[in-house]
Structures are given as structure tokens and as C-alpha cells.
């Protein structure tokens, strides 16, 4: 027990206290607390430390053979004793992050209604569109400072999961706490239940969501607007993170709200920031700059285009023109290279088309240039996959790239593992160990010709917890593009490969707290510089970040009057 930490005064006692995950200590309640909070007889006699509890919990965790059972077990601890949950996860972060988030969370979302045990967060149905204020007032946590919200339409690479998408905000906020030190008392996961177009969900008798085709058009837009206004009335300073919205809604929602409220979209901006940070590290390791690269994307959705725009902005910051930077970025989707004159492109895709003058001398058997055609003609040095289509980084494609680039940078970022464009093992073999690889899902190190290559996971968890920590520590009112660019720069400075010439592109997850604090500092400094937070000294800023950083330790309790 941490007696040096001031006590917490609480009104709960007896079974009600044991049923409150944020406050429950289980067998760690002291003799005095058991007496004054009417817990005597409700717990076994032994009084244990959190270390003893964690040891038991980890042993139980290891007894489960498959990842889904492990996920369910950890979620049960989270819904019973949050302090113990976060101590356990932090003690085994590399082992458990793939269980509480990608890739296991994908299966958890698909099976959400089947494995449902207990409600967490808020389910805001379109049927309650006129009562959103009332629903927000029902939240278990009332001092909310960060919200992760989804409508469940584009869950990872798995598509429309309806309310099953709630697994993503729950998992994301668990990482805000485990990686970024955001107190779980300040978090709120929300799913906007606007129906589902997934026939499997609608036909499933176990499905717990609103059984209705998805609301679209102005009705959908107005519903989201009412939600945002209600959040602003209830928690005007809360950071809102949009998560796993479909392509047709993700970018428009971000554009509509980014200058009105403190918000960001992790799929677009967080993925872009961690990718740019990883690219900066890879460029340093390869002895070049990002502005010198030619970048090809497979996947031209909102996430891919968001990453591309972030790369272009970084290139421009390194001294080249916007037009030159755009000429070095090639977007390929199912119809081939995005080019001038292509029909049915979305606004954010139009900004990334290749001009005819840039491809007039290209050689191809087809008018629509394939990924291989781009490899052959553009001779890119960077290849990024955000397609959600497995296996499209073929041996032919990778080896064509390697012909023109000694150290190709290859990032197959699609999640979950089953959707990855190519495995690190194949990429390393096809390039004889020369490729610099980062993936979206976790992969084991690759051994080739007697050398071991650690594979960096280009995981948004390296970025968004630090952004959240920086924003909340200084009460920033916006999340700007410049703040996100600072997060990328700070991440790149943590790269073992860039710093030491060996190791992975990104630091091990065991260093995530150090990384998050570094990113928080960089993001907060930029927010202050841009006028989005009150000015303070660097020393005071670092102190604020340290003070805000929540740690999973049990506090002493004293009882207040009811």
C-alpha cells in the first residue's frame, strides 16, 4: 500500500465497493479498510499486495490456451478491478497488447454479442437521438476527459460489425491508460448504434444492437452533430477520438469538427503520425531524408490518403515544394494508380492523383497502371500497404522494387494479421535481408542467413497515448496538424535502428512510457506555441506531464458521509 499518497475519500461500502472496478482492491483491502467499509466476511482472510494479486492473475492468464479466452479473461479483470488489470498489463505489455488490442480485438468485435459479460461505456442508439444528454449523464465515469467513439462500420479490416465495434473504443482506451498514463476514471468508450448492413449480424439471434439498416445521409450527419453538441455541453474540454468510421464518413467528420472541438481521427491522423515517425527513423537508418523518397501506397482510402498527406507535409517541411512532394507519392487502389481524369474519386483522393505529365513515358500493357507497373516505372523507395487485402505485396512486386533500391522501406500495415499485404519473413527473404520493415500487426523476429531481424510494429499505440497525455496535461483546445507532426519527430528520435544502427525501427513496448512522455512534451510544446494552451516553462510542462501520469497503485481509502 502506498501510504505516502494522500487518501481517497469514497462513499461506497460493502458489496457496492467490491462491484466498483475503479475502486475495488479485492484481497488487498487492509484490515482497517475492511472494518470501516463493511467488507469483513466478504473477502478471504489473507491481505495481499498488488504484486501477489498480479502473480496469481498472470498464472491464471497463462492457463488459457487460445487468445480469445485470454482476451475474455483480461476483460473480466478490467471489469472487476481496474488497478489490478493495468498493473498486470503494464508488467507484461509486449505479451498482452496483442491480446487486449490488435489482432485479438478483431475477433472480439466479431463475437461481441456472444462473449458479452458486462456493459462498459455508452451505447447511444439512433432510437435515442433526442435523449443523448440523458444518456451521457448515465455514464459510470463523470469526470470524462477523453472519449473514443465509433459507429462500428469499418472495424479494422473486418468491415461493418455494428455495436460489436465497441471492442475498439474499449481496447483503445485501455492503451491510453496502459501506455499513456491517462487515468481510467477519465475515459469513456462510446458506440453510436446507427444500425448495421452486415447480414450476418442482422440474422444473428444473439446480436445485441439495433436491428436496422444503417442510417445514412443527412439523418446520420444530424445524429453525429447532436452527439458532438451533447458532448460539448457535458464535457466541453474532453478530447474526442473518432475511431473506425467508414471511409465515406471518416474524413468528412474530421474536416467538420477538427477546428470546432479538440478531436482527432486515429485511423487517419494517428496512423499517419506513427507511419511518418517510422519513416523518418528508416530514412535516417538508410542515410537519407524523407524528401528524397518516392513513396507508393497500396490502398487509397481515408487512412492511406491521410498518411500520404502527412508524408507530403513532412517533405515540404524538409524544403521541397508541395507540387514536387505530390509528384513523388503514388496512390494505387483496386483500379490501379490514381491519375488525372479518373472518375468517381473522392475529394481527398483527387488531391493525390498523379498528373499525366509525370507518367507520359511510363511503359505498361494496360492504361490503368498496376502496382507492379508503378514499381517498374516510378522506382519507389518506400512501399506502404493499407489495403486490407492479403498477399498483394508479391515476390514479383518486392523484387522489382529491390532492383532499383538497395534498401527498400516496406510497411505492410493492414490489420489484423490475416489481412497483411506480405509477411516480414517473405519481405526479408525476397530482399536478402536488405528491406527495412515495419508492420501493422505484431510479428516475431525473422532469421535469414544466420542474422535475426526484429520487426517493428508500426503501432498507433506509440503515438495516440502520448498525444492524449500532452493534450490533457495542459488542457489544449485543439489537436493541430503541427502537433501531430511533432509527435512523429519525437517518435523517430526513439528509434534504436536510427540511433544505434541496429535493432528495430521502433523501440520495444517496454519503453512505451518513456516514449509517450517524450511525445506528450513535444505535442504540448507545439500546442502552447500555437496558442492552444496557456504558456508555461519547459520545466513546468514536464512536471505537469509527470503529475498527470496515472500509475496502477492502490490508494488508501477513507469513508465520507453518505
From Swiss-Prot:
InterPro entries: Aminoacid_DH-like_N_sf, Malic_enzyme_CS, Malic_N_dom, Malic_N_dom_sf, Malic_NAD-bd, Malic_OxRdtase, NAD(P)-bd_dom_sf, NAD_malic_enz_proteobac. Gene3D superfamilies: Malic enzyme, N-terminal domain, NAD(P)-binding Rossmann-like Domain. One of its GO terms (biological process) is malate metabolic process. Its EC number is 1.1.1.38. Keywords: Metal-binding, NAD, Oxidoreductase. A divalent metal cation binds at residues 243-244, 267. Divalent metal cations. Prefers magnesium or manganese. The keyword Metal-binding applies. It comes from the Bacteria. Its cofactor is Mg(2+); Mn(2+). CDD domains: NAD_bind_1_malic_enz. The keyword NAD applies. It catalyses: (S)-malate + NAD(+) = pyruvate + CO2 + NADH; oxaloacetate + H(+) = pyruvate + CO2. It holds the Pfam family malic. One of its GO terms (molecular function) is oxaloacetate decarboxylase activity. It is an enzyme of class 1 (oxidoreductase). Homotetramer. Belongs to the malic enzymes family. This is NAD-dependent malic enzyme. It comes from Aliivibrio salmonicida (strain LFI1238). The lineage of its organism: Bacteria, Pseudomonadati, Pseudomonadota, Gammaproteobacteria, Vibrionales. The gene is maeA.
